[in-house]
């Protein structure tokens, strides 16, 4: 059976990462609460190193490698944010990195991978399997794969987001009525769910994915990892991955009381604007997907307290400008 993530994994990751990464703020604004009709607490992972939560899992996995593996180098496949994170983690630990990216990856994410010193390799999602592309490099060069979500070390690192949220909410004497998390492969969702459920056993989790993909909605019903063809034209690149991870799914199913929502481009762009206007932060559309989903379902949460993970802020200027004028 695929192993599930535990709170002990996350606590160990938090100890490992404490010397390398700073906590991100949990933001709340009266004007945002008024707009939603409920108290909204947004975890600003857009302010983390590399502009997204992904550095937590990537660095936790990198620090677990032995010196020989680091010298040979690492590889990953990514829509961009995990690629940046692996590139940064490799740079910080003295390892070479190769990042396999879709040809449609946002320019800012490609540039940041290269800024951190990584080699970038592109593939066509319509014709190629990203894991097979990475597999060729692994076979030829002996590289170590840092999987974007189906790896307990990565999941544990992402779970430190939830651990911080628990501490920050407790400081304010707030018990959340619901948690909303953007979701693609499931590394962040499984990590946050594990941390939050350790504190509050009954809080429901709402996963948010890209409309037209809905692999998690299906996976929660079939209880099997789902595979989908990525969308060809979307600003939700950060949650446009083709597959549900086996380990994240096992963790989520073991916890239960999990629901799946989906949002489209227009909704996500609207949420980018909401975050900027009320919280003064920059989220990418995928990073604002949870906020968009809550907005679409806000009538069901009137008067409640909702934790939303703002997972990243790596957005091209043109897309951000489009969001502000939507």
Model-derived features: positions:
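PLP-dependent amino-acid enzyme catalytic core
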Residues: 1-326
């Amino acid at each position: 059976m695929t192993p599930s993530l535990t709170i002990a994994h996350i606590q160990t990751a938090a100890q490992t990462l404490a010397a390398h990464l700073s906590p991100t703020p949990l933001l709340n604004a009266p004007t945002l609460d008024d707009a939603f009709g409920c108290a909204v607490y947004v975890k600003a992972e857009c302010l983390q190193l590399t502009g997204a939560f992904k550095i937590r899992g990537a660095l936790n996995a990198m620090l677990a490698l032995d010196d020989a593996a680091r010298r040979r180098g690492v590889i990953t496949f990514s829509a961009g944010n995990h690629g940046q994170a692996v590139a940064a983690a490799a740079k910080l630990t003295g390892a070479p990195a190769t990042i396999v990216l879709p040809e449609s990856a946002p320019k800012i994410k490609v540039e940041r991978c290269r800024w951190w010193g990584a080699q970038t390799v592109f593939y066509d999602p319509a014709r190629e399997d990203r894991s097979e592309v990475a597999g060729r490099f692994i076979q030829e060069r002996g590289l170590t794969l840092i999987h974007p979500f189906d790896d307990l070390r990565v999941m544990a690192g992402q779970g430190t987001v939830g651990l911080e949220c628990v501490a920050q909410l407790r400081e304010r004497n707030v018990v959340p009525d619901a948690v909303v998390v953007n979701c693609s492969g499931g590394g962040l969702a499984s990590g946050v769910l594990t941390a939050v459920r350790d504190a509050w056993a009954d809080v429901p989790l709402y996963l948010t994915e890209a409309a037209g993909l809905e692999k998690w909605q299906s996976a929660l019903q079939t209880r099997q990892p789902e595979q989908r063809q990525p969308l060809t034209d979307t600003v939700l690149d950060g949650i446009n991955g083709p597959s549900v991870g086996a380990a994240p799914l096992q963790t989520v199913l073991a916890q239960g009381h999990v629901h799946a929502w989906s949002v489209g481009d227009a909704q996500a762009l609207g949420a980018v604007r909401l975050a900027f206007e009320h919280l003064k932060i920059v989220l990418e559309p995928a990073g604002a997907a949870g906020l968009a989903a809550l907005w679409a379902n806000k009538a069901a949460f009137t008067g409640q307290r909702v934790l939303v993970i703002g997972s990243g802020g790596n957005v091209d200027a043109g897309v951000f400008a489009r969001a502000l004028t939507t």
